[in-house]
């Protein structure tokens, strides 16, 4: 077991095994069985490339052997920052064959985030494209390797400069090693299969260990409530590093059933609608902001989208009007809302739930042994129908962040329930309704941004005396960030200058404020904290005056 990982208590592990939730098989062994069973079926389509399950397994095996040649070993951590291309699947499953632990970084992460992941995890390698959207990832990895001696390997998809390994060459190169060597590697199903990421409210990223046992079960249960089967075809358009497109049911859930996954490295309607028509896509997972963009694109009426059966929507609450308009434009589809978190617990509206229930709720847990508590500020369970903080425990919900004992003491109850920070109410149907959140996060199009992280950076600006970042409503993204700033005497600051300053700190683009409010003072709570409710109310009133709300 990797040091710093919090195991499930033995009594719970025994229960989950006895009930058949945990099969004590690694993702490597699960994938090997899938590849043998569905060998001739197409697994992935990436633009004009079609790859069968057998071909995917063969290339992942060859890559795994070559990664062993380059010095990677079981339990080594590897930062994976690849776009939605077939090489992602080759690399992901190659790491599983070795027993390495991928760290699922987003393409938008920059030096600040990636260097933190490397430091927290002790990562041995990092893989990324050479360039994407005018950003040079080779320069990023070179800087991080210079700062962190544990990062031994830089692997590049595309043009690999001197000192880097070419991912394409590693996939194609024959190894002198035997594939049997991979089978001899012992993988503990209770070890992490991967690390998902959680920004949290402190701004310091945390690593979420998802074990082989819990992540296989996660994918199977998500597939069971989304009508996945061998004849279904998924369009994966959200970044594969996210939990939803990877395993809820995502790529893993469709593979388990021998389905087909079409990868898209764009979200534009002009690219997506032809893909749906050409490949007869049955399932797609989105965030509300993306769905809103699609249904407002005039091109949507020019393509045959009648193959679509399920649109999963997650990350934010979907407004009933958007659901109604989607159904009007694509009568064949059921919009299935879900609530999930990389930490584990998933809630899905069931496809056969009553229309009123689907309109009002985000679903209910997918496992019979998922445990939910709604509690008040003193951890007392609230009365039925009342709002409380959502606490979760179950066979695929983590028991602790990696290497974070002090934070874990605050993030979990003494009996192992995870404190989500989300406020919920139980619907009479048994499903749940999201009512807000306790944690200081801004939800921009499904990406959760720590207000504290951005505030700490803004406070380093020489013109800033104090700052509070708050969400402002947005019809498409749900929320955008507004920075409320008190300036130092005699100083001035404009939004473009603030954005440029933050960009120099090399944080992800989605964390940049999109509105700046200069204020004389902040209302303080009785405990001396800035009243963010007062700020959001003041800005909401201003937006109404401007006709923007």
Can you say where each PLM-predicted feature lies in the sequence?
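Conserved AMP-binding/adenylation subdomain of ANL enzymes
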Residues: 216-233, 243-282, 297
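Conserved structural elements of the adenylate-forming
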Residues: 57-62, 189, 194, 208-229, ...
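Structural core segment of the AMP-binding/adenylate-forming
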Residues: 70, 98-169, 489-491
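Conserved AMP-binding/adenylate-forming core of the ANL superfamily
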Residues: 21-32, 40-85, 89-93, 110-115, ...
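Conserved pre-ATP/AMP-binding loop-to-beta segment of ANL
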Residues: 39, 161-162, 175-197, 204, ...
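Gly/Ser/Thr-rich phosphate-binding loop
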Residues: 281-285, 295-357, 367, 371
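AMP-binding/adenylate-forming catalytic core of the ANL superfamily
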Residues: 109-119, 126-130, 284, 394, ...
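AMP-binding/adenylate-forming catalytic domain of the ANL superfamily
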Residues: 156-157, 507-529, 548-549
């Amino acid at each position: 077991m990797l040091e710093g990982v919090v195991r499930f208590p033995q009594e719970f592990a025994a229960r989950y095994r006895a009930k058949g939730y945990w099969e004590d098989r690694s993702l490597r062994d699960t994938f090997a069985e899938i590849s043998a069973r569905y060998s001739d079926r197409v697994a992935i389509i990436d633009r004009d490339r079609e790859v069968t399950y057998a071909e995917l397994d063969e290339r992942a095996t060859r890559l795994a052997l070559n990664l062993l040649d380059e010095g990677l070993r079981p339990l080594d951590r590897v930062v994976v920052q690849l776009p939605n291309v077939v090489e992602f699947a080759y690399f992901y499953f190659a790491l599983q064959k070795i027993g390495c632990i991928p760290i699922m970084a987003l393409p938008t992460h920059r030096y600040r985030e990636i260097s933190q992941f490397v430091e927290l995890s002790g990562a041995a390698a990092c893989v990324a494209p050479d360039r994407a959207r005018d950003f040079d990832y080779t320069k990023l990895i070179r800087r991080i390797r210079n700062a962190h001696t544990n990062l031994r390997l830089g692997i590049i998809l595309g043009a690999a400069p001197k000192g880097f390994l070419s991912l394409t060459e590693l996939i194609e190169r024959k190894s002198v090693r035997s594939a049997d060597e991979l089978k001899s590697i012992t993988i503990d199903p209770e070890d992490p299969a991967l690390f998902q990421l959680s920004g949290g409210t402190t701004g310091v990223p945390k690593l979420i260990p998802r074990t082989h046992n819990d992540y296989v079960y996660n994918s199977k249960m998500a597939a069971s409530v989304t009508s996945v089967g061998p004849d279904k075809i998924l369009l994966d358009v959200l970044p594969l590093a996210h939990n939803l497109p990877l395993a809820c049911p995502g790529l893993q859930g469709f593979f388990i059933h021998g389905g087909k996954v079409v990868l898209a490295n764009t979200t534009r309607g002009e690219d997506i609608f032809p893909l749906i028509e050409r490949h007869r896509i049955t399932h797609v997972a989105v965030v509300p902001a993306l769905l809103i963009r699609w249904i407002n694109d005039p091109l949507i009426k020019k393509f045959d989208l009648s193959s679509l059966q399920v649109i999963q929507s997650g990350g934010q609450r979907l407004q009933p009007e958007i659901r109604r308009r989607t159904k009007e434009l694509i009568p064949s589809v059921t919009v299935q809302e879900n609530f999930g978190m990389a930490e584990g617990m998933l809630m899905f509206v069931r496809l056969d739930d009553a229309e009123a229930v689907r309109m009002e709720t985000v679903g209910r847990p997918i496992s019979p042994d998922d445990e939910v508590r709604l509690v008040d500020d003193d951890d007392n369970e609230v009365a039925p129908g009342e709002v409380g903080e959502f606490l979760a425990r179950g066979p695929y919900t983590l028991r602790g962040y990696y290497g974070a004992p002090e934070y874990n003491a605050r993030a979990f109850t003494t009996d192992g329930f995870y404190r989500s920070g989300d406020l919920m109410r139980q619907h009479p149907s048994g499903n749940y309704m999201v009512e807000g959140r306790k944690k200081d996060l801004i939800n921009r199009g499904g990406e959760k941004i720590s207000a504290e992280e951005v505030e700490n950076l803004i406070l380093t600006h020489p013109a800033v005396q104090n700052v509070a970042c708050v969400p402002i409503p947005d019809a498409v993204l749900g929320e955008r960030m507004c920075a409320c700033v008190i300036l130092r005497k005699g100083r001035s600051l404009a939004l473009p200058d603030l954005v440029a300053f933050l960009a120099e700190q090399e944080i992800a683009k989605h964390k940049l404020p999109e509105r700046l409010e200069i204020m004389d003072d902040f209302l303080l709570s009785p405990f001396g904290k800035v009243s963010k409710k007062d700020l959001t109310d003041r800005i909401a009133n201003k937006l109404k005056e401007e006709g923007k709300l």
